[in-house]
């Protein structure tokens, strides 16, 4: 039996948020893998929204398999909606075949006596599902559950809420499905196979987009020092603070000129705040000085916060908004003609109340309102400069307006971004901290990457707004440079040119790009292509330059070495490809026999051995693996680690790959031989593609000092 466990999806009210794409993906994955049941451990909504609840329940019911659902604390945030939400909660005891799932409703950190009574009847085939870790429940309830746990250590207890995953004994913390909040790794769902008694994760994979690096930049709190850093690291996007105008004009101009000469493309200047007091807008002298400085620098972009005026003030007197936008429009006309203006969202502070006395611009619709009002009066383009930290550190509004909601509602208007991490420190939540991991504790950038790849977010400058004058942004730049330098590759994929493939090359390539693949080889079957070889080769060759700014595209071909599928007398028909993959070499009927190297030399191009245990091949033919692999390396032959796990292959894994990853001696032999190892997902359906497995294998090879086959194709 296969059971799917999920938690912490946090569906918001906006159905265009990326969380709904995760739900669609999860349901599709559950169907493809023929799961027997689905169990959801709470927080299916962000704040108990009725419409989000209905959408979730409809999707789960449409699976047509047993489902167990419990609420989490987020589902109970809107008091008036709690009765509606809880009508969909499963009973305490749920039978799934010969297994039992005890559904513990601990959404308010308490557990009913009825539930404790059910817990006393558990056996080896029982799963206990709850939302919170039991140690975090209210005092006496936690003590009572811990006592029960001591008596039943063999029962599996699964929970969510932490947004991070771990397994200790039979306690299982489930990874969040929400790409806004999944900690430490990508959002995922978790399957449990009752036959093997193993958990396996399926990831909603959100890698760093291949094309984001040219948009990355820094906010300069120490302009001279920071611009020197930009020169050294090829940073093409720069934001200066308004205080930069205090630097000698000739000095700052020379620095900007040098930066542009070195490839700088987008210079932004952050504006002073806009105030309204005593019937007057802003500081006229300050603003005029800012506009003059922006024009002098020939800025490509300026950013400004929403007006520092209360919601109540603007609602009571609409003329104030008119005065503010008139004030700004009059000055923005003096900016360079192509200069873009980005309106930035703000956030709740300890001084604010969550009512109309707070500052305007804490929620998406207010930012959009101001942007559109200003845009109607300006000749310059007006958009949104979306600050992710401000959107996240915005309680209580962050519960309703999740990051995914901000992206869905304002993404099409964005002209830039401020990215940073929010950290919970001794003084409370702190913004503008370095991003030291992509999937952080308070902000996971998985949803940002997913939105970027899906076109929900416009491609625009991504500024790391890390405050400090001593290069506090450097760890963040280093983190992204590490990912930029990863040359993740996949040399085994199929299109509709193969009989077993289904998708057009364009769709296959787009899938690889969205999965963060840098070098991608399409390698359709020789026998499937048939007499269309020139058509196939021409098509892939024509597509390569079209996608060259996002991915390096190779055209390979996969050869079955069975005599009925390949004519060994015409090897020249393979010469024009970038490489070939060879399969069936262990088959006694095959054309290779014990002379793989000679066979490969006929094609006069790089050859790789696909989905084959080369140690077994050496054993079969009496070769010393180290010597044979060394000889293969001399001929630029490579060996594939096939990481396929898809519907075409029945979701089975190659044993030789798992064995290699666990066998240090085999790794040593390959490492010493200098043999290049390739990674191939062997994809036949785009919806099956699992980029996480490709990245995982690439990282494994690099971490173990094993040569990778991408090196054979990088000039």
Where would I find each of the regions flagged by the language model?
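Conserved beta-sheet core of the metallophosphoesterase superfamily
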Residues: 62, 68, 138-200, 661-665, ...
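Charged catalytic cores and adjacent phosphate/nucleic-acid-binding surfaces used
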Residues: 381-383, 419-425, 479-491, 495, ...
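His/acidic metal-ligating clusters that form di-metal
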Residues: 26-37, 100, 110-170
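Binuclear metal-dependent phosphoesterase catalytic core
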Residues: 17, 21, 164-210, 462-464, ...
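Extended substrate/RNA-proximal surfaces in nucleic-acid metabolism proteins
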Residues: 289-304, 312-331, 354-374, 526-641, ...
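Histidine-acidic metal/acid-base catalytic patches
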Residues: 207-213, 224-231, 291-300, 311-316, ...
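An N-terminally biased module of ancient metal coordination in phosphate/nucleic-acid-related enzymes
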Residues: 13, 30, 210-221, 226-250, ...
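N-terminal active-site segment of His-dependent metallophosphoesterases
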Residues: 1-55, 485-515
């Amino acid at each position: 039996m296969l059971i799917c466990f999920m938690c912490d999806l946090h569906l918001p009210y906006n159905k265009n948020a990326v969380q709904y794409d995760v739900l669609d993906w999860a349901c599709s994955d559950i169907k493809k893998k023929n799961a027997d049941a689905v169990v959801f451990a709470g927080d299916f909504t962000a704040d108990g929204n009725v419409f989000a609840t209905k959408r979730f329940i409809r999707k789960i019911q449409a699976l047509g398999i047993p489902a167990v659902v419990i609420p989490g604390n987020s589902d109970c945030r809107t008091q008036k909606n709690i009765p509606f939400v809880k009508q969909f909660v499963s009973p305490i005891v749920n039978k799934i075949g010969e297994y039992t799932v005890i559904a513990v409703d601990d959404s308010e950190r308490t557990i009913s006596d009825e539930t404790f009574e059910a817990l006393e009847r558990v056996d080896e085939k029982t799963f206990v599902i709850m939302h919170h870790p039991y140690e975090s429940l209210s005092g006496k309830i936690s003590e009572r559950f811990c006592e029960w746990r001591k008596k039943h250590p063999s029962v599996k207890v699964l929970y969510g809420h932490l947004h991070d995953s771990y397994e200790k004994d039979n306690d299982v913390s489930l990874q969040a499905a929400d790409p806004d909040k999944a900690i430490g790794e990508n959002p995922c769902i978790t399957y449990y196979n009752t036959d093997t008694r193993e958990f396996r994760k399926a990831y909603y994979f959100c890698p760093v987009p291949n094309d984001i690096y040219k948009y990355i930049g820094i906010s300069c709190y120490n302009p001279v020092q920071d611009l020197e850093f930009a020169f050294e690291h090829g940073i093409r996007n720069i934001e200066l603070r308004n205080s930069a105008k205090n630097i000698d004009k000739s000095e700052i101009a020379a620095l900007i000129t040098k930066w542009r000469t070195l490839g700088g493309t987008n210079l932004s200047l952050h504006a002073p705040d806009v105030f309204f007091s005593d019937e007057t807008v802003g500081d006229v002298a300050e603003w005029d000085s800012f506009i003059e400085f922006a024009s002098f620098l020939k800025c490509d972009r300026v950013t400004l916060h929403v007006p520092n005026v209360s919601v109540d003030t603007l609602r009571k007197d609409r003329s104030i908004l008119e005065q503010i936008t008139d004030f700004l429009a009059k000055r923005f006309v003096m900016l360079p003609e192509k200069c873009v203006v980005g309106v930035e969202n703000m956030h709740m502070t300890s001084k604010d109340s969550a009512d109309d006395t707070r500052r305007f611009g804490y929620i998406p619709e207010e930012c959009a309102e101001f942007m559109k009002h200003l845009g109607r009066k300006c000749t310059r383009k007006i958009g949104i400069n979306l600050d992710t930290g401000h959107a996240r550190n915005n309680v209580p509004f962050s519960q309703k307006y999740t990051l995914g909601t901000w992206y869905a509602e304002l993404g099409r208007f964005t002209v830039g971004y401020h990215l940073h991490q929010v950290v919970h420190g001794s003084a409370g939540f702190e913004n503008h901290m370095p991003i030291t991991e992509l999937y952080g504790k308070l902000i996971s950038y998985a949803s940002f990457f997913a939105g970027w790849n899906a076109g929900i977010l416009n491609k625009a400058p991504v500024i790391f707004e890390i405050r400090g004058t001593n290069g506090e942004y450097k760890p963040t730049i280093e983190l992204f440079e590490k990912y930029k330098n990863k040359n993740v590759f996949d040399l085994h994929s199929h299109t509709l040119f193969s009989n077993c493939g289904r998708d057009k090359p364009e769709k296959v390539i787009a899938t690889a790009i969205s999965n963060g693949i840098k070098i991608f080889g399409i390698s359709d079957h020789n026998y499937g292509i048939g007499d269309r070889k020139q058509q196939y080769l021409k098509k892939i060759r024509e597509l390569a330059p079209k996608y060259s700014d996002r991915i390096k595209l190779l055209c390979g071909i996969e050869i079955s070495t069975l005599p009925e599928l390949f004519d060994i007398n015409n090897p020249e028909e393979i010469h024009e490809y970038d490489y070939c993959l060879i399969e069936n070499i262990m088959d006694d009927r095959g054309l290779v026999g014990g002379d793989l190297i000679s066979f490969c030399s006929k094609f006069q191009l790089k050859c790789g051995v696909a989905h084959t245990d080369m140690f077994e091949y050496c054993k079969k033919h009496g070769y010393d693996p180290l010597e044979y692999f060394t000889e293969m390396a001399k001929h630029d032959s490579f060996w594939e680690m096939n990481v396929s796990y898809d519907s075409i292959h029945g979701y089975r894994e190659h044993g030789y790959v798992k064995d290699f990853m666990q066998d240090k001696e085999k790794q040593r032999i390959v490492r010493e031989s200098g043999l290049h190892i390739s990674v191939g997902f062997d994809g036949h359906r785009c919806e099956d593609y699992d980029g996480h497995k490709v990245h995982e294998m690439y990282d494994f090879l690099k971490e173990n000092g094993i040569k990778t086959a991408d090196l054979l194709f990088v000039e």
